[in-house]
């Protein structure tokens, strides 16, 4: 970790486009990338690979502290690569089984503390783009640029619907909207690190904006702060 390396945090609710935007900005600047939302899935997957029980807080904490992972920003229109211990696990960590495991490990306080430290270790020169829900409020409160990206629940459901339809999945727009609203409720009301913009965050509503328009706004904020 290099505490002097600049960090740009991009937080927001599920489906806001923060992952896409974070990857594109990281690729454009040549900076490191952190997808914090994937870390619990990665830990659950890694624990299963090493035969560690998902209720063993002590061993999980040790795994979390030494999680060997790299996020590689993808070209526009493609998914980012997630490399765990030298293996591309971008797709395998997205299964329902891994997701259930991620929920289990995320409930363990010592694991959360260990992953907080691990996230901060991603801060390296020339800089870091950190994507998540509490990057600007908890993980990198000193970041020189914090972005809170949102969109209406209806628009986020529509985007997710089109994404899943494109993969050939049979989904209902109304059920996706219900899921997103429920997720928003959980994220904003939870006791630990609730989803909310940092006091000094730039808030961007992307409901009516294209990805390029969002990128242009962030580029402008980067230039104003002389971050590159």
From Swiss-Prot:
Keywords: ATP-binding, Cytoplasm, Kinase, Nucleotide-binding, Transferase
Compartment list: Cytoplasm
InterPro entries named among the record's database cross-references: Cytidylate_kin, Cytidylate_kinase_dom, P-loop_NTPase
EC number: 2.7.4.25
Main location: cytoplasm
GO CC, alphabetical: cytosol
Alphabetical GO biological process terms: nucleobase-containing small molecule interconversion; pyrimidine nucleotide metabolic process
Catalytic activity: CMP + ATP = CDP + ADP; dCMP + ATP = dCDP + ADP
One Pfam family of this chain: Cytidylate_kin
Similarity section: Belongs to the cytidylate kinase family. Type 1 subfamily.
PANTHER family to which the protein is assigned, alphabetical: CYTIDYLATE KINASE, CYTIDYLATE KINASE/PANTOATE-BETA-ALANINE LIGASE
Protein name as catalogued: Cytidylate kinase
Species of the source: Pseudomonas putida (strain ATCC 47054 / DSM 6125 / CFBP 8728 / NCIMB 11950 / KT2440)
